[in-house]
Amino acid sequence: MALEQALQAARQGELDVLRSLHAAGLLGPSLRDPLDALPVHHAARAGKLHCLRFLVEEAALPAAARARNGATPAHDASATGHLACLQWLLSQGGCRVQDKDNSGATVLHLAARFGHPEVVNWLLHHGGGDPTAATDMGALPIHYAAAKGDFPSLRLLVEHYPEGVNAQTKNGATPLYLACQEGHLEVTQYLVQECGADPHARAHDGMTPLHAAAQMGHSPVIVWLVSCTDVSLSEQDKDGATAMHFAASRGHTKVLSWLLLHGGEISADLWGGTPLHDAAENGELECCQILVVNGAELDVRDRDGYTAADLSDFNGHSHCTRYLRTVENLSVEHRVLSRDPSAELEAKQPDSGMSSPNTTVSVQPLNFDLSSPTSTLSNYDSCSSSHSSIKGQHPPCGLSSARAADIQSYMDMLNPELGLPRGTIGKPTPPPPPPSFPPPPPPPGTQLPPPPPGYPAPKPPVGPQAADIYMQTKNKLRHVETEALKKELSSCDGHDGLRRQDSSRKPRAFSKQPSTGDYYRQLGRCPGETLAARPGMAHSEEVRARQPARAGCPRLGPAARGSLEGPSAPPQAALLPGNHVPNGCAADPKASRELPPPPPPPPPPLPEAASSPPPAPPLPLESAGPGCGQRRSSSSTGSTKSFNMMSPTGDNSELLAEIKAGKSLKPTPQSKGLTTVFSGIGQPAFQPDSPLPSVSPALSPVRSPTPPAAGFQPLLNGSLVPVPPTTPAPGVQLDVEALIPTHDEQGRPIPEWKRQVMVRKMQLKMQEEEEQRRKEEEEEARLASMPAWRRDLLRKKLEEEREQKRKEEERQKQEELRREKEQSEKLRTLGYDESKLAPWQRQVILKKGDIAKY
């Protein structure tokens, strides 16, 4: 009990509680958290200088005490960016600037690692920080700044130690290598163009910055390196692997497409493995299709005698195996039919018209836009061949029946979710015979009668069709199966759990070594929080070389993402975890979040013959009550928040890690996070009195001649608004401002700026609902042509995706709610009446308060 009180008081700056505990004799050097950190550490990491001085000067706690990983309070203050606490600890607390933790990191390393340029600047100019100091793995502060992407800190470190630009860690990583590995294009350009960093420098395993960028799928970095330096796409590491091997093994289809389009060659490594071997071994179907389209040989065997199909089959990737086995029986000209089976299920760019980088037909120039995620197979979907389409095409006339059956089977397999059942492609479905008698008209208000006894009953599915359904359903769930397998193997033997045990060829994936210290990642953890709930790399392990499961030489891995996704997840860091926002003031909330909603006006009379009112929709976020705001990791994005320093004063409390791309560059749905005071199903328009395309600016209580299909009614400031038609007549201009009341329920006029904010919110809501309606119509049109069982499977998948999106939006809402509550408490503490402040006044006051804190 005393431990929790002391740690909480130290973090929140409650000096009275600390005094009472000290008077009771409960503050002592033995009062440590599970990571052996004292209250002194917690006060330093929270920036509570007055509590820190009390604990050291009056409670006599050691200011230079070390936690389990060897960190002093000065390390904590530097890692969290609290310069005042760091200055006091170094000048009067007994800590030294050259003190190292168990991994050899100084306070300068930690300031660069976590992106605090103001701390780096003070340490270099006034604090005696040494930019040449190296950790146990040979990492300099400049390595940490480059991997973090902290451009201001990097410039400061380069000015004080220019020779560090090409310095290598013990596993051979340079700052440029780490910047490319993390995808920091601006840092990469600065290091090469202004600092003279060598883009050809190799790590000890032979990997270059180009290999690191390809391994992690950073297209902009790859494009810049190839375009603005003299690096070659055919460069090999010590195992003979090229950038194409790394991109294919990780499923980076966009990178693989770009490499092929710009001269990359499909070559074998020293173990005889081609990029197709790597893609098949890891179950990357799209990469296999891209490589096959571009002429990859399917019968090439590695030194162990395995083809790509053999590796895919051995590792349990049935979809890849089926694809590769089928393609083996086809000629090269028919392999250009290759398509991604999931292409129709995701938002893909239209076909560019280019079938292959090596095609000789006349094509339009490809517009490669790095800023938008394009279809990874968009350049390979079409061909000059008359048989390039897989839908509704008959086999070539001159082929034998066996050859035609192979091509037909191939086309069925390419698109299992959307294609017709085997044997029905190209054949029109005969309509059912009309009944021999006219059906009697049903009486009004009753349902149709059941079919007469003579009506033929539907036939049950036969055995082969049921087997096809099972196989297609299994293929449909391939990616889910892989994710479950990743989780199962994450605690076992790493990536090689499914690899053939007699193979000597090195895999392209890397296993994560277990972490023994989670100290820096746990700086903001509450005492009662579960330690194991935050997977990730600790600082003392992040500078160690990553060993492949069956390799003898160390291979560099990319920086930690904050979560372990499994054996095929991005390898963990050579240096440090994912990006974190600097500690301090978080971004100001949106203007729409800062004003309380006006009181609801009295509800108008309901329309005539209206049904009972629907249940009230959820309250808008502005008026919701305070929530706990408990942070949790997001399973849908595959990453967790790392290094979450909680600021006890309640001002912008959390440091959130960047959510980076996973192993694929496919577009992922993202929530827009819009907060509105309007909720409902239809567009926030009003009901017209007649079906004519004319609209009255006032709300009409007259019932519409075409009642809406939805059973809910929108709520505007607590008042029921007649439900609008789903789609207004063409040419109708909706006067949204007329829907906003001018007075609240007490009769007081609503300020004009508030009404304008409400108008903007309603307009955004209308746009969102229109877009959602359009997407639903497209989805229904696409599902209408599918069999019922396939339609149900697809709907279930879409519902799961919507549920994940809803959970993410709910988490963001809770986070915003907690942040607004903290700001309201701060305003009340400063003596302001929040209801009398405009949003810009709130921002100015909160900003001044944060500046004064430092």
UniProtKB/Swiss-Prot annotation:
Any single biological process term in GO: actin filament bundle assembly
Gene behind the chain: ESPN
Effect listed in the UniProt record for changing R774Q: In DFNB36; uncertain significance
PROSITE patterns: ANK_REP_REGION (PS50297), ANK_REPEAT (PS50088), WH2 (PS51082)
Region feature Disordered, mapped onto this chain: 338-400, 415-474, 487-713, 765-788, 800-832
Gene Ontology molecular-function annotations: actin filament binding; SH3 domain binding
Positions with biased composition (Low complexity): 378-389, 633-642, 692-703
Segments of skewed composition (Polar residues): 352-377, 643-652, 667-678
Protein name stated in the entry: Espin
Recorded domain comment: The WH2-domain binds actin monomer and mediates actin bundle assembly.
Keywords, alphabetical: Actin-binding, ANK repeat, Cell projection, Coiled coil, Cytoplasm, Cytoskeleton, Deafness, Disease variant, Hearing, Non-syndromic deafness, Phosphoprotein, Repeat, Retinitis pigmentosa, Usher syndrome
Phosphoserine sites (modified residues): S338, S342, S515, S647, S690, S696
Record note on quaternary structure: Monomer. Binds F-actin in a Ca(2+)-resistant fashion. Interacts (via N-terminus) with BAIAP2 (via SH3-domain). Interacts with PFN2. Interacts with MYO3A (via C-terminus). Interacts with MYO3B (via C-terminus).
ANK repeat start and end residues: 1-31, 35-64, 69-99, 103-133, 137-167, 171-201, 205-235, 239-268, 271-300
InterPro entries reported for this sequence: Ankyrin_rpt, Ankyrin_rpt-contain_sf, Espin/Espin-like, WH2_dom
Known function: Multifunctional actin-bundling protein. Plays a major role in regulating the organization, dimension, dynamics and signaling capacities of the actin filament-rich microvilli in the mechanosensory and chemosensory cells. Required for the assembly and stabilization of the stereociliary parallel actin bundles. Plays a crucial role in the formation and maintenance of inner ear hair cell stereocilia. Involved in the elongation of actin in stereocilia. In extrastriolar hair cells, required for targeting MYO3B to stereocilia tips, and for regulation of stereocilia diameter and staircase formation.
Subcellular localization: Cytoplasm, Cytoskeleton; Cell projection, Stereocilium; Cell projection, Microvillus
Pfam family, one: WH2
Superkingdom as given in the UniProt entry: Eukaryota
Coiled coil: 756-830
Biased composition (Pro residues): 428-463, 595-620
Disease in which the protein is involved: Deafness, autosomal recessive, 36, with or without vestibular involvement: A form of non-syndromic sensorineural hearing loss. Sensorineural deafness results from damage to the neural receptors of the inner ear, the nerve pathways to the brain, or the area of the brain that receives sound information. DFNB36 is characterized by prelingual, profound hearing loss, and vestibular areflexia in some patients.
Major location (coarse): cytoplasm
Domain WH2, chain residue ranges per copy: 651-668
GO CC entries: brush border; cytoplasm; filamentous actin; microvillus; stereocilium; stereocilium tip
